[in-house]
Amino acid sequence: LKLEPATPMGRENPVLPDDDTQADTYLAMCRLLGRNGFEHYEISNFAKPGFRSQHNFKYWDLSDYLGLGPGAHSFLNGRRFAFARDIRAYISGESIPQDEEEVSDFRRQGEYLMVRLRTSDGADMHDLENRYHVSTAPYEQVFRMLEKHGLAAHEGTRWYLTEQGLSLIHI
């Protein structure tokens, strides 16, 4: 997470902890929550068993979703778009989808890996092959290198980041 300059905290420009301190704090938080019965199911989400966010799963699974209202974002049939943030334009019917982009299969592969590796479920290579009709050998080669350094692990065809691996992409 980052500080946005136009926010009160961003304008104060506080001194933030260095990357190592942030990583140590993150790992300590993961251990504390784990000891207290919370499962770490996504890089910045913890929940008691059975209480994972169902809403966010659509994003992590790259499913279609429709956002309605000013500033709402949608992803439908390989197309990403948003409505204007201006509520008056939205109410008057003048708000048409903007920031439209067609998302290529190649980009969707990258997004699949990016969002799935944020979750404890990880990225299933069989699922990736079936969705995008690609060889996963290059990805698996990278995962094996990460595994040697304790940053990734796998169960069958599913690869996921370890807590140490998550701490590096979290900061």
Language-model features: locations:
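A short, conserved structural fragment
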Residues: 148-157
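Accessory beta->alpha helical hairpin/"wing" motif in late/C-terminal subdomains of nucleic-acid enzymes
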Residues: 157-167
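Alpha-helix C-terminal capping/helix-coil junction sites
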Residues: 34, 147-148
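Short amphipathic alpha-helical interaction segments
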Residues: 134-145
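Extended hydrophobic-aromatic, low-complexity segments
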Residues: 125-126, 137-139, 154
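Long, charged, low-complexity, helical-prone intrinsically disordered regions
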Residues: 70, 148, 163-164
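C-terminal scaffold of the Radical SAM
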Residues: 1-134
